[in-house]
Amino acid sequence: MQRALRLMEAVASHSSGAPAKQLAREARLPLATTYHLLRTLAHEGYATRLPDGFWVLGERVESLHGRSRTQQLLARLRPALVALRDELGAAAYFGMHVDDEIRLIDIADGPRAPRVDLWVGFEDAAHATAMGKCVLSQFDDERRRDYLSRHPLVDLTPHTITEPGRLMRSLSSSTGLLLDREEYALGTGCAAVPVTDATGSVRGALAVSCRPGKLPKIERAASQMRATAERIQRTLTLHS
């Protein structure tokens, strides 16, 4: 394992690739061992031999790098979610607008702050979730109508807003706080605030869920949610 890692480090140090003999010298490995390891790495997708005989990192390394960056980013974001959960006694959620979809990224819940039953994916329920409505509220009318034209307003509970005009009117908020009053799941209410970038463009939303009767308390904590959203915004700006 150590020899393979040393060899991969040697390959990674050459942006245009390098021949096996050079890699063997730099990794301090016998040439026969180097060839064996390179063949194994190539078979698994971690190294690629170019037509000129030079070796470069394979596609699976790029995939791992992307996953690693995502994990590191989530590790930096999670303390903010956990702190908000503990402050409000409610499960906290972070979602992002990625590839024109609204995706749930992370949840901080616990025995005293249970998460909502995610029985329908957030990608298909933006109209019924505080998080989804919060992101939609940051779109201009044209972009919002385009999104809704591709995502039917499915009736999830008796409280779900399925009439486009009414939904559009519900997306205005003087405080930036958007609510879901049992529109996604009966017995659960949610509140969300937007997370933007430095230019003010929406990146996602921060949300909390609770019993419907607790929503007034959550509404009064809008400033705490906005402060957490700003903390998340700074983290995204610095590390993504």
Residue ranges of predicted features:
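N-terminal helix-turn-helix
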Residues: 1-71, 230-238
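An N-terminal domain-start capping segment
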Residues: 1-15, 81-104, 227-240
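A structural signal for short hydrophobic beta-strand segments in well-ordered beta-sheet cores
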Residues: 47-48, 94-95, 195
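Amphipathic alpha-helical effector-binding/dimerization core
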Residues: 53-150
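Short, basic/aromatic recognition patches
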Residues: 76-84, 148-191, 231
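Juxtadomain coupling helices with adjacent low-complexity linkers
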Residues: 164-168, 186, 202-240
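A short, hydrophobic, proline-anchored segment that marks a local hinge/packing element in signaling
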Residues: 191-199
